[in-house]
């Protein structure tokens, strides 16, 4: 199996998706982070596709090559879109892998649609259980930080995306080996999305309370987080998510940034493979 396609959704919009690998293999479904596309998981898809798995990834609505509707950019709709895709492909015993915002999407998908089609899940640098600082989340990220992200998107999103990559990949740390090409790829992916969809998604990834969704994730779940994640702090998200999940395995990458699917791709690939096969 080697293809990409578009799925027309119930509301008339559509999802671009890739469906690679062995069609008879166990399906691994990837949900990407903001403001990226399915391309952000190409290292993992290539690796696991070569191991005999069926690997699937879509561009979230408002992102990449998917439709750019004015409305519907919230975690419930993202989860329902994912449910439509898994039903369309009739996936069974799937492993869902979500990075950053995609981790929230996976959690809400299971929270709303159950585990009937799901065998396992992996949350990488995920926004679960909630990012923003609230009364019940006093150690969260202040809302003013997300207001600044919104301002950056509106004022000059190309420049903002490029600047964001320094913290995203940890290139602002002493001794870090910067890849200008990776930074440019991030910007290119981000600019494919609609400004309205990406703007609205900031509220979705920062303010959605996913605590109850995590409690409903009764399947084995791998939590991977870098302890130097400057975008989604480990202490606020990864650590807390692992404590809430009923059946969690936590792996902390020492010195790991938010973009560990790229900066630590060999380690991510092997940890995912070991988890899927365990």
Feature-to-residue mapping (PLM):
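Flexible "cap/lid" loop of the alpha/beta hydrolase fold
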Residues: 107-112, 116-155
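Conserved acidic catalytic loop of the alpha/beta-hydrolase fold
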Residues: 77-94
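Conserved HGGG/HGGXW glycine-rich cap/lid loop of the alpha/beta-hydrolase fold
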Residues: 13-71
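Short beta-strand/loop motif that positions the catalytic acidic residue
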Residues: 217, 223-225, 229
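Catalytic active-site module of serine/aspartate enzymes centered on a nucleophile-bearing elbow/loop
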Residues: 248-278
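Conserved alpha/beta-hydrolase "nucleophile elbow" surrounding the catalytic nucleophile
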Residues: 32-34, 94, 98-100
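Conserved alpha/beta-hydrolase catalytic His-Asp/Glu region
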Residues: 129-141, 151-215
């Amino acid at each position: 199996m080697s293809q990409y396609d578009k799925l027309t959704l119930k509301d008339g919009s559509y999802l671009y998706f890739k469906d690679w690998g062995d069609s008879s293999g166990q399906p691994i479904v990837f949900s990407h982070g903001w403001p990226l596309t399915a391309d952000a998981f190409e290292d993992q898809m290539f690796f696991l596709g070569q191991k005999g798995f069926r690997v699937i990834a879509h561009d979230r609505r408002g992102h990449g090559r998917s439709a750019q509707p004015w409305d519907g950019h919230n975690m419930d709709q993202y989860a329902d879109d994912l449910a439509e895709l898994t039903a369309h492909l009739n996936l069974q015993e799937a492993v869902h892998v979500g990075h950053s915002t995609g981790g929230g999407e996976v959690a809400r998908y299971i929270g709303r649609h159950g585990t009937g089609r799901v065998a396992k899940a992996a949350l990488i640098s995920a926004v679960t259980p909630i990012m923003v600082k609230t009364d019940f989340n006093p150690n969260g990220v202040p809302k003013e930080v997300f207001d600044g992200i919104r301002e950056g998107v509106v004022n000059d999103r190309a420049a903002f995306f490029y600047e964001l990559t320094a913290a995203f990949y940890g290139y602002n740390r002493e001794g870090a080996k910067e890849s200008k090409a990776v930074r440019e790829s991030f910007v290119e992916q981000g600019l494919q999305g609609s400004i309205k969809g990406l703007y609205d998604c900031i509220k979705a990834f920062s303010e959605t309370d996913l605590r109850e969704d995590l409690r409903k994730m009764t399947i084995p779940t791998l939590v991977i987080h870098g302890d130097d994640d400057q975008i989604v702090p480990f202490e606020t998200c990864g650590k807390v998510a692992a404590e809430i999940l009923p059946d969690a395995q936590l792996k902390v990458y020492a010195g790991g940034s938010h973009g560990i699917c790229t900066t630590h791709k060999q380690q991510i690939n092997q940890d995912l493979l070991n988890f899927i096969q365990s």
